[in-house]
């Protein structure tokens, strides 16, 4: 019996697993049926099915799923499944929205039946998911069914996978799902209800299907069609001709593919360069492109019609889009080639093979469809009543609201509508009256089209079917039941829609309220008469002749702006001059475009009445609510200024803003409107179409329109302010404008001369045809049709607010092509476009579009306007039938089906076949993954995520090589035996598991998300930013620029290349970075901090990802050894091969530094990342590197260039660090380089010789030389031994170097010089930054610490820059260049008393100076984003080293001499597992000297009380979460931390390992030798730097002294904090600190541990400083503060918006600094800065508090760490672990208890608890992930905003076209040109006025949008510049050429300019927003106004 029972149970488990893992629709249904049969369950019993299934399937894998579903189902809104118990619902379509609706209805207790027409889920297309949708799906157990669901940064999923997930959930809940059933209509209840009480049924095919017998009370259409259910009228949005092409390529999930970054599209919106290159290279002309990596490689692009014609994709050009895109008119082969070519180019040919996936017809999965017209249903639901039966009919998904692709709006709004519909059904079932149900549903539906990820509620955990939980300002009673009566169809209402329009849209043109409208010309005339009263020579009696002299116009302007016109000086006789003056001033100052020229006005007998009405209306609208000058005589100057500002138009502001090429002009009204618009634009962000909607879509109620009008008027005032700002900015822009701008004259001045070749204002300048008043635009004195206003080069339709004009040849260009005007390119390029122009001239609609790829439709529309009706109707009518049938993609699909069946007679291929073909690579792995996911949520998800990381994230991990493989390669390169590899591999898995478990589901989710995200999202970002490797991601700029970058890299062998790369990326980066400066940094750091993160990720992935620390250690050890060797060789080679190294370094640096850190720092960061990844990357490199000269260089080059994609992280990391370091000191550095690279490297750095060389480049040549002698010995031993301890750290140190390396590699001296130069540049940058900050009202970041010292340092000495590393310890001076060496010194110090004193010595001014320079550097690197990543790796390294050190240190009294390292235990051993051993060893080795240097890194963390540790963690956590903060963090923290950590970590770790090594290798002396260099290094620091550092330290002391010092002195418990402080505080601390800092970031305690000793020794700032290194502590502190200040400043520079955050970050950073008066302060500050930076934006206050707390506690901790705490190390470690987990738990679902439990379990499983290093690494990793995720979110937000703006601009264009069309018709009638004779019909005149007003509103709205777009563009540019600058500044100034330095200055200046522009824009928008807020008391009305009618995207 028992056995049989067991078999049954096992079988059930197998069947359940099969069901969960099913990959097709049919397979899922079959598996589910088998499961039910086996368990003897009947799904038809829907009420109890789920509960029975749950009770019968007692399977641990299922329990996690039950838990999630129970949690969801227990929500109060579902009333325990009894809310809709007797309601029967039919859902049409098993798409994502239909299934999602079914799930909610089922949870409500309803009987739900879903019918699906097909039986296969075949759509590979990828959907972008908004954050709430991810949260929602996770809550339904998505990860249980699809382990890779949104892992890491991935936030998209294929439609197929989403359907499978929801299908499985639906089946489990007992929902009936029928496939192969097609809905054909409703069957009304029979009239004879007495005999048969039959209700509503469905008519289906096949007719005999049981579903046809069901009766329903609710039917929901979710099949994506437009006409499945009757009664829903559609609103159409017609944009420009938009042709989309989607393509799916097979994803084989190879490493190479994993490295290719995704493209999210944001960069392309503003980055025209890529599209230009694409067109030049391939002839493909796109408007946009997006690439998502999912089960397939999914590309979606918007192609321009002309390029499709040119490439032969479309055979014939038809006006009708249906004909145009019909299968007969499309060459399929050409289409495939077109898609493949575009995909290949956009990914830089990095996808190895682009084989098409197949669709369900077995054909290549490529589709082309038209989404010019998108539809939205006018209502979401209706009720039908027939024969006593009511039927509630509703729509969800695309049927309700078609999405504008590809922003993820479809699924997001679809899910929202699904929940809204469920809420409606709930109300219906609970007995609410039908009209009330409908009124509530429509009130909610009003908001749906306006939802964006930003304006929905942010508390996703509270989401339920109740709309109040999802829409922030919802008024569910907005509509009254009486207003929706038309939606209740009792079968009697004849004209539902007429009634509906009257009810819902009482006014079709809400904007024109009676009092606002100038409907009667008498009103306008009366206003003009009042304004011109009392002016001599002005007598206004009409709207024509009275204005001829021009005096009346001048009088109106003078009345309001007497400052603009000297009325008394005007001569009444000079008609032309007077009019031209008025026109010019109105255009320039008020944003009102002229309707004619002064010359024309003088030459005509009587001015045209219609033109004058049009023109004067704009003055009326602008000034009607303003005070005239006579009324303002009593106002003070300030009030007058405000008044003046209020009469300035945003448009004019916009036209000046950054219009260095040419002035942008806005339509006459546009500027005015802009004024309104600007204010609205703020709102626009949410629904950017506010105004226009009002004007065109008469959807809003009257109230809304009036409110809107009021708002508009108010906005006008704001506009003026904008204009005022614009004028001020304009002067500056013009000063800075490029020479070319001379050709571009101000519009005003140009207009003054009436072009002789013009026929007048009624003749189009371009096509020479008649241009009517309503369609007339003017720019530069020319008048033309909107559709004729095109770029001479590319024929893109131009906007008045964005164009460039070449005065000499009278041609207009889009800004990107202005530079081509003289190149002959224009002529060459124009041909392709030429037809367009010609066609435009013809005025054919199709031509317009053709010419306009961007605004095809609009052009067409414009032309159509000319011949009203025809074109438009022509376009619309042919496609109407089809359009009503289905959505664009559906139409495409149906076309395909038809053509396929006719031509090839193909049947649909089975879903299995399709899946097998498309997903072969996925399916092989899939089962395991799925199984894993089902296993245990936390474990599974973590595992999967980790797996994903391995597979997909390899990029982040090892640059695309799975870590295991990387390890193997690494080992092989190192000469590791296969067995060892196997051993390490075995080790790693354990660790991975542990980590996974430890992280838990949520954490894991985060990690997964972050890592994968970092892979995917990061890739996307990278793509946008750079094609670089994940490591390079940081630096990555747009992928568009990647190529450039690579080329530049090639050209610039040294850091220059990296810099150059950055610039290339700059544009894209700007976009990305700008919009997400923090993101980019954060992402880079997290994701792409290749140096930091990459290093760390490698490290972490290696170590962290490596589940167990031991494993990681082991791996690290072997890797480190190999790496060390490689690195050494590489270093040597690097010097020899500067160009190669620079490239690679650049890449690595770029990646690393790209975020915030300077290259050096990044290098440091990189190293750590490299150590694992590097080792792997290095393996190839290593081999080559082995031959120091040739191999390394050539390989790096190859690797670097190609591997960018292939070996981005690792190789880049490896090469970068290696090269960098070797450059400075070939010999010394070589060793160091390897050391740095490898964990051992870090350890090795302890050997003074090696580190010094490495550091030397950073610090100064002298150091290298001194160290040089030691390098070789240190090299190998250190390399090998330190590897383990240093794995993380070494990477970090190396990265530091590597960043500085490009030039370093080339030559030590050069490097030094460059470093100096760099520091000068940095200083200049900081100063400017401070200025900007001040101008912004922000407190300038305190740069004195980092920046100033840095400057002096560099100035005084190259070493200065490196001084931070030098700071670490006297010995480390040589090591200085290598941050890690510093650490060794510190360790060394413990080894030898001499060392220790040097540590203290740093106190000395020179020390401080060193520190300052170090700080500066650190700042840079931190800012690069090293901080986060570095922190991770450093933390890890520190954790292993420091923790190990802590343990040993703790074990051994500080005073006792360090015991010799166990002979068998090498640094490598120490590495991860070795951490513990290492710690002991370190302790023994370093103890006496260590007390200050060692103890504090390792032990402090251990000893500090948990609380303290936690605090630190909390701090870290706080800092972790936010991308914005991340940016700051990268800026602040990363810089500080990174450098510091680099230096910091290595010192402690190295000390021990070094000592061990030294002892083992007889290297102790070298360490001591190092010490002297360190001392020397300290002196190297300039006095200025020292002073600055000291000042900083003092300031910090003051702020934190009491707390931090007291704490530090009072308790060693604060050790943790001390650790944090230490990491910031000393360079050794820096190297350590980097690790520690990272750790501290992650595990403040970790940091504290390392720092404690130092702190203890130097309770006072100075004392602490010396202990850390020469100037290490001080330097650390200083540098950390300085860097954080710097980074803050930088961020402020970069992103004005960040200013506040930065301020906070600054403040926060400072408090931390304060906590550790000396090093501790710095250390604390540093970690804090990093963390805070990360979190500052989001949790500024919290951060501050936590920072201060942790700071204060940390210092005390540090002080106490000395003796007792060392022992505490293990405890501390555990606590750190916990804390880290806890801190992460904030981010994750894990609770602290869970974390504790987990950690305890882990420790049980693995006796060895996570070392502090590991913990910190993990923490760092999480932080990085959080930052990455945040950055990604920022990027996505920017993308979303850009796409919304783009779409709205298209909408505005279309509306304008329609208005112009009507206006032309009315004008013709009024002029008698319509064949009816001249009519003075008052009705026509009234109509004319209305149209004029609407057009003005449109223009104003368009200008608003343009301002938003401009602001977004500036944000983006700033972000890219910021990124590039970071990359460049990461390289030591002494490594840079004059050209590079001047380039940096240029970038800085440009950035300042961008910041100023953005600040003015932001200020303007903010002011308008505030004004609007005051005027808008009714929020609901505001929502309405926001474009419910306009924006259906």
UniProtKB/Swiss-Prot annotation:
Main location: cytoplasm
Region (Disordered): 658-704, 854-886, 905-1023, 1039-1309, 1332-1546, 1559-1837
The entry's keywords: Actin-binding, Cell cycle, Cell division, Cell projection, Coiled coil, Cytoplasm, Cytoskeleton, Exocytosis, FAD, Flavoprotein, LIM domain, Metal-binding, Monooxygenase, NADP, Nucleus, Oxidoreductase, Phosphoprotein, Zinc
Bias (Pro residues) ranges: 1245-1255, 1454-1465
A GO term, aspect molecular function: metal ion binding
Database matches in InterPro entries: bMERB_dom, CH_dom, CH_dom_sf, F-actin_Monoox_Mical, FAD-bd, FAD/NAD-bd_sf, Znf_LIM
Cellular localization per UniProt: Cytoplasm; Cytoplasm, Cell cortex; Cytoplasm, Cytoskeleton; Nucleus
GO biological process: one example: cytoskeleton organization
Ranges for region Monooxygenase domain: 2-494
Biased composition (Acidic residues): 938-951, 989-1014, 1065-1090, 1516-1530
Coiled coil residues, start to end: 1817-1983
Extent of Polar residues compositional bias: 860-873, 1230-1239, 1257-1275, 1434-1452, 1623-1633, 1754-1763
EC number: 1.14.13.225
GO cellular component: cell cortex; cell projection; midbody; nucleus; spindle
Domain Calponin-homology (CH): 518-624
Residues engaged in binding Zn(2+) 1: 764, 767, 785, 788
Record field: compositional bias (Basic residues): 1686-1704, 1819-1830
PTM sites of type Phosphothreonine: 887, 1274, 1339, 1452
PTM-bearing positions, type Phosphoserine: 649, 685, 687, 977, 1131, 1187, 1272, 1276, 1335, 1369, 1382, 1431, 1640, 1692, 1695, 1903
PANTHER family xref list: [F-ACTIN]-MONOOXYGENASE MICAL3, CALPONIN HOMOLOGY DOMAIN-CONTAINING PROTEIN DDB_G0272472-RELATED
Quaternary structure, from the entry: Interacts with RAB1B, RAB8A, RAB10, RAB13 and RAB15 (in their GTP-bound forms); binding to RAB1B is of low affinity compared to other Rab proteins; at least in case of RAB8A can bind 2 molecules of RAB8A simultaneously through a high and a low affinity binding site, respectively. Interacts with ERC1 and RAB8A; may bridge ERC1 with RAB8A. Interacts with KIF23 and ERC1; enhances the interaction between KIF23 and ERC1. Interacts with NINL.
Similarity section: Belongs to the Mical family.
The name this protein goes by in its record: [F-actin]-monooxygenase MICAL3
Natural source organism: Mus musculus (Mouse)
Origin organism lineage: Eukaryota, Metazoa, Chordata, Craniata, Vertebrata
Gene: Mical3
């Amino acid at each position: 019996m028992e056995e049989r029972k067991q078999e049954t149970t096992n079988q059930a488990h197998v069947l359940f697993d099969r069901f969960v893992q099913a990959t097709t629709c049919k397979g899922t249904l079959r598996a589910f049926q088998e499961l039910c049969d086996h368990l003897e369950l009947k799904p038809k019993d829907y009420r109890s099915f789920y509960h029975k299934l749950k009770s019968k399937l007692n399977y641990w894998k299922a329990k996690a799923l039950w838990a999630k579903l129970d949690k969801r189902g227990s929500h109060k809104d579902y009333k325990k499944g009894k809310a809709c118990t007797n309601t029967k619902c039919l859902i049409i379509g098993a798409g994502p929205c239909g299934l999602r609706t079914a799930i909610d209805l089922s949870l409500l207790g309803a009987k739900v039946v879903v019918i699906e027409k097909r039986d296969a889920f075949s759509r590979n297309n990828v959907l972008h998911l908004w954050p709430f949708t991810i949260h929602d799906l996770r809550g339904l157990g998505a990860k249980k069914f699809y382990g890779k669901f949104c892992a890491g940064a991935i936030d998209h999923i294929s439609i197929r996978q989403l359907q499978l997930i929801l299908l499985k959930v639906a089946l489990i809940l007992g929902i009936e799902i029928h496939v192969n059933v097609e809905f054909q209509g409703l069957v009304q209840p029979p009239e004879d209800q007495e005999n048969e009480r039959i209700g509503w049924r469905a008519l289906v095919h096949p007719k005999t299907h049981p579903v046809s017998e069901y009766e329903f009370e609710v039917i929901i259409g979710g099949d994506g069609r437009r006409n499945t259910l009757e009664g829903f009228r559609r609103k159409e949005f017609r944009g420009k001709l938009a042709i989309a092409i989607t393509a799916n390529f097979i994803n084989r999930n190879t490493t190479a593919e994993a490295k290719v970054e995704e493209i999210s599209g944001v960069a392309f919106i503003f980055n025209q360069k890529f599209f230009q290159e694409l067109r030049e290279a391939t002839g493909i002309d796109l408007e946009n492109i997006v690439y998502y990596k999912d089960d397939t490689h999914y590309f979606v692009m918007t192609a321009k019609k002309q390029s499709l014609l040119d490439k032969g994709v479309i055979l014939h050009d038809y006006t009708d889009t249906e004909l145009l895109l019909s299968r007969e008119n499309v060459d399929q082969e050409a289409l495939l080639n077109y898609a493949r070519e575009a995909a290949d180019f956009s990914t830089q040919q990095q996808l190895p093979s682009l084989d098409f996936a197949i669709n369900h017809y077995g054909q290549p999965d490529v589709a082309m469809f038209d989404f010019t017209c998108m539809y939205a249903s006018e209502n979401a639901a209706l009720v039908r009543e027939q024969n006593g039966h009511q039927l509630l009919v509703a729509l969800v998904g695309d049927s309700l609201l078609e999405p504008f692709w590809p922003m993820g709006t479809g699924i997001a709004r679809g899910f929202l509508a699904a929940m809204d519909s469920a809420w409606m059904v709930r109300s219906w079932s609970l007995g609410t009256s039908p009209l009330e149900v409908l009124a509530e549903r429509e009130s909610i539906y009003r908001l749906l089209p306006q939802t964006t990820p930003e304006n929905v509620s942010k508390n996703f955990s509270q989401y339920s079917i109740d709309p109040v939980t999802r829409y922030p300002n919802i008024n569910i009673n907005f509509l009254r039941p009486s207003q929706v009566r038309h939606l209740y169809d009792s079968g009697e209402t004849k004209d539902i829609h007429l009634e509906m329009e009257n009810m819902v849209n009482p006014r079709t043109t809400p904007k024109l309220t009676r009092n606002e409208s100038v409907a009667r010309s008498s009103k306008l005339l009366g206003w003009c008469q009042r304004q011109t009263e009392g002016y001599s020579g002005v007598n206004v009696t009409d709207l024509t002749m009275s204005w001829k002299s021009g005096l009346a116009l001048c009088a109106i302007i003078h009345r309001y702006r007497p400052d603009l016109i000297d009325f008394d000086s005007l001569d009444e006789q000079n008609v032309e001059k007077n009019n031209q003056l008025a026109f010019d001033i109105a255009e320039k100052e008020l944003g009102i475009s002229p309707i004619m020229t002064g010359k024309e006005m003088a030459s005509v007998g009587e001015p045209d009445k219609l033109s004058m009405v049009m023109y004067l209306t704009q003055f009326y609208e602008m000034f009607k609510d303003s005070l005239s000058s006579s009324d303002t005589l009593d106002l003070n100057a300030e009030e007058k200024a405000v008044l003046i500002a209020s009469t300035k138009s945003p448009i004019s502001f916009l036209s000046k803003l950054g219009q260095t090429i040419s002035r942008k002009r806005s339509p006459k009204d546009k500027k005015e409107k802009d004024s309104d618009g600007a204010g609205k634009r703020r709102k626009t962000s949410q629904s950017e179409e506010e105004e226009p909607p009002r004007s065109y879509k008469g959807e809003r109620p009257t109230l809304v329109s009036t409110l809107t009008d009021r708002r508009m008027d108010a906005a006008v005032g704001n506009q003026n302010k904008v204009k005022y700002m614009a004028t001020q900015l304009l002067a500056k822009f013009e000063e800075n404008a490029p020479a070319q701008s001379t050709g571009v004259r101000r519009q005003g001045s140009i207009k003054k001369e009436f072009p002789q070749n013009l026929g007048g204002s009624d003749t189009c300048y371009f096509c020479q045809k008649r241009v009517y008043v309503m369609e007339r635009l003017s720019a530069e004195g020319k008048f033309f049709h909107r559709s004729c206003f095109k770029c001479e080069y590319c024929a893109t339709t131009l906007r008045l607010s964005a164009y460039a004009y070449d005065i000499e040849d009278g041609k207009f260009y889009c800004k990107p092509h202005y530079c081509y005007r003289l190149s002959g390119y224009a002529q060459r390029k124009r041909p392709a476009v030429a037809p367009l122009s010609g066609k435009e001239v013809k005025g054919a609609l199709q031509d317009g579009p053709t010419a306009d790829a961007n605004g095809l439709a609009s052009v067409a529309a414009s032309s159509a306007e000319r011949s009203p009706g025809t074109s438009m109707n022509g376009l619309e009518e042919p496609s109407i039938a089809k359009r009503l049938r289905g959505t664009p993609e559906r139409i495409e699909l149906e076309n395909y089906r038809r053509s396929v069946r006719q031509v090839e007679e193909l049947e649909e291929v089975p879903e299995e076949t399709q899946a097998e073909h498309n997903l072969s690579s996925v399916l092989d792995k899939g089962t395991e993954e799925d199984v894993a996911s089902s296993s245990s949520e936390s474990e599974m998800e973590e595992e999967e995520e980790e797996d994903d990381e391995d597979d997909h994230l390899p990029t982040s991990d090892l640059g695309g090589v799975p870590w295991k493989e990387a390890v193997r390669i690494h080992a092989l390169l190192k000469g590791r035996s296969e067995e060892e590899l196997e051993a390490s591999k075995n080790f790693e898995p354990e660790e991975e598991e542990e980590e996974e478990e430890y992280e838990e589901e949520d954490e894991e989710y985060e990690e997964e998300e972050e890592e994968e995200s970092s892979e995917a999202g990061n890739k996307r970002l990278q793509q946008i930013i750079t094609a670089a490797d994940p490591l390079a991601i940081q630096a990555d700029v747009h992928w568009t620029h990647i190529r450039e970058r690579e080329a530049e890299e090639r050209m610039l062998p040294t850091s220059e290349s990296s810099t150059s790369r950055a610039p290339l990326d700059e544009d894209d980066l700007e976009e990305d970075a700008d919009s997400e400066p923090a993101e980019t940094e954060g992402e880079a750091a997290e994701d792409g901090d290749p140096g930091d993160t990459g290093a760390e990720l490698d490290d972490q992935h290696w170590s962290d990802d490596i589940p167990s620390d031991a494993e990681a250690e082991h791996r690290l050890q072997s890797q480190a050894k190999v790496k060390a060797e490689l690195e050494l060789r590489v270093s040597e080679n690097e010097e020899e091969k500067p160009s190669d190294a620079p490239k690679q370094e650049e890449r690595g640096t770029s990646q690393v530094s790209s975020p915030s850190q300077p290259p050096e720092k990044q290098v440091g960061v990189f190293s750590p990342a490299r150590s694992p990844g590097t080792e792997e990357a290095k393996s190839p490199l290593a081999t080559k590197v082995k031959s120091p000269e040739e191999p390394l260089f050539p390989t790096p080059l190859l690797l670097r260039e190609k591997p960018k994609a292939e070996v981005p992280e690792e190789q880049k990391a490896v090469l970068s660090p290696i090269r960098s370091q070797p450059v400075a000191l070939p010999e010394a550095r070589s060793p160091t380089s390897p050391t740095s690279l490898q964990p051992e490297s870090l350890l090795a750095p302890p050997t003074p010789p090696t580190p010094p060389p490495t550091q030397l480049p950073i610090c100064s040549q002298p150091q290298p030389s001194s160290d040089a002698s030691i390098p070789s010995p240190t090299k190998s031993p250190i390399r090998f031994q330190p590897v383990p301890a240093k794995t993380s750290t070494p990477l970090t140190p190396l990265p530091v170097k590597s960043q500085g390396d490009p030039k370093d590699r080339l030559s030590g001296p050069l490097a030094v010089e460059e470093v100096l130069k760099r520091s000068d540049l940095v200083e200049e940058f900081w100063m400017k930054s401070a200025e900007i900050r001040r101008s912004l009202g922000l407190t300038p970041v305190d740069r004195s610490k980092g920046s100033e010292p840095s400057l002096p340092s560099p100035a005084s000495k190259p070493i200065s820059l490196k001084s931070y590393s030098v700071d670490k310890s006297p010995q480390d001076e040589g090591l200085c260049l290598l941050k890690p060496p510093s650490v060794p010194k510190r360790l060394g110090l413990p080894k030898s008393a001499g060392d220790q004193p040097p540590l203290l010595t740093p106190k000395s001014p020179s020390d401080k100076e060193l520190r300052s320079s170090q700080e500066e550097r650190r700042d840079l690197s931190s800012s690069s984003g090293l901080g986060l990543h570095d922190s991770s790796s450093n933390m890890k390294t520190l954790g292993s080293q420091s923790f190990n050190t802590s343990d040993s240190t703790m074990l051994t009294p500080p005073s006792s001499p360090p015991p010799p390292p166990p002979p068998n235990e090498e640094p490598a051993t120490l590495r991860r597992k070795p951490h513990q051993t290492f710690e002991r060893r370190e302790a023994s080795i370093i103890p006496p000297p260590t007390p200050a240097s060692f103890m504090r890194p390792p032990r402090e963390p251990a000893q500090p009380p948990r609380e303290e540790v936690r605090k630190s963690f909390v701090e870290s956590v706080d800092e972790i979460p936010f991308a914005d903060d991340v940016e700051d963090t990268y800026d602040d923290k990363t810089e500080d931390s990174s450098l510091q950590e680099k230096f910091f970590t290595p010192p402690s770790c190295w000390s021990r390992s070094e000592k061990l090594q030294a002892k083992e290798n007889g290297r102790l002396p070298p360490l001591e030798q190092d010490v002297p260099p360190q001392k020397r290094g300290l002196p190297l620091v300039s006095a200025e730097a020292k002073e600055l550092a000291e000042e900083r330290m003092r300031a910090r002391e003051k702020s934190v002294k009491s707390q931090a010092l007291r704490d530090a002195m009072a308790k060693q418990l604060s050790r943790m904090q001390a650790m944090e402080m230490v990491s910031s505080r000393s360079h050794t601390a820096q190297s350590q600190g980097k690790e520690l800092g990272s750790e501290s970031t992650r595990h403040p305690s970790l940091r504290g541990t390392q720092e404690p000793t130092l702190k203890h020794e130097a309770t006072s700032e100075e004392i602490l400083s010396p202990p850390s290194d020469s100037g290490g502590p001080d330097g650390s502190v200083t540098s950390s503060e300085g860097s954080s200040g710097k980074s803050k400043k930088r961020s402020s520079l970069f992103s004005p918006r960040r200013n506040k955050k930065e301020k906070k970050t600054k403040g926060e950073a400072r408090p931390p600094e304060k906590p550790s008066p000396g090093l501790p302060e710095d250390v604390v500050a540093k970690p804090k800065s990093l963390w805070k930076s990360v979190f500052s934006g989001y949790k500024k206050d919290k951060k501050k508090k936590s920072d201060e707390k942790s700071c204060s506690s940390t210092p005390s901790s540090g002080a106490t760490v000395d003796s007792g705490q060392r022992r505490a190390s293990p405890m501390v470690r555990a606590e750190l672990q916990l804390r880290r987990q806890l801190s992460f738990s904030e981010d994750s679902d894990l609770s602290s208890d869970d974390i504790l439990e987990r950690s305890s379990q882990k420790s049980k499983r693995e006796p060895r608890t996570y070392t502090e290093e590991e913990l910190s690494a993990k923490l760092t990793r999480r932080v990085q992930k959080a930052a990455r995720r945040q950055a990604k979110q920022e990027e996505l937000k920017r993308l979303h905003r850009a796409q919304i703006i783009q779409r709205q601009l298209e909408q505005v264009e279309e509306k304008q076209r329609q208005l112009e069309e009507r206006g032309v018709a009315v004008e013709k009638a009024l002029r008698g040109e319509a064949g009816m004779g001249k009519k003075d019909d008052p009705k026509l005149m009234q109509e004319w006025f209305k149209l004029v007003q609407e057009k003005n509103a449109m223009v104003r709205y368009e200008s608003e949008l343009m301002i938003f777009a401009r602001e977004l563009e500036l944000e983006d540019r700033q972000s890219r510049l910021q990124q590039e600058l970071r990359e460049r500044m990461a390289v030591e100034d002494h490594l840079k050429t004059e050209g590079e330095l001047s380039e940096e200055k240029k970038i800085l200046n440009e950035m300042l300019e961008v910041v100023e522009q953005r600040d003015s824009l932001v200020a303007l928008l903010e002011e308008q927003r505030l004004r609007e807020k005051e005027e808008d008391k009714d929020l609901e009305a505001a929502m309405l106004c926001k474009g419910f009618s306009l924006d259906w995207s």
